[in-house]
């Protein structure tokens, strides 16, 4: 069911990972896809701030942003250099108080 009114001014943090261990082709494909996603969000009217996670320092990357002012579009599959860390990503969002897209940490820990 469509919403009667859509909010298009909601600031978005587009969080995505690029692991330095990936090959050049995979890193470039990830950048191109993130750029396309950013463009689509902007086309809908959202101010977008891309946050590229290239090390396992997601929490420090998010520190400058107020969780009451941004929603996180979570496209970060894991923390670089930390295999099987997919449940840690939403755990960080939750601890910092961000609203985010995707499954929560408990679901991803299963």
Can you describe what each PLM-predicted range is?
Residues 1-110:
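ATP-binding N-terminal substructure of ATP-dependent carboxylate-amine bond-forming enzymes
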């Amino acid at each position: 069911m469509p919403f009667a009114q859509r909010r298009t001014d909601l600031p978005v943090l587009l969080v995505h990972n690029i692991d330095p261990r990936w090959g050049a082709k995979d890193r470039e494909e990830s950048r191109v896809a993130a750029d396309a996603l950013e463009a689509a969000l902007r086309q809908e009217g959202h101010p977008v701030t891309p946050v590229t996670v290239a090390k396992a320092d997601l929490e420090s990357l998010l520190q400058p942003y107020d969780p009451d002012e941004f929603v996180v579009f979570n496209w970060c599959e894991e923390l670089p250099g930390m295999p099987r860390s997919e449940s840690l990503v939403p755990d960080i969002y939750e601890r910092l108080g961000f609203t985010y897209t995707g499954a929560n940490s408990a679901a991803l820990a299963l």
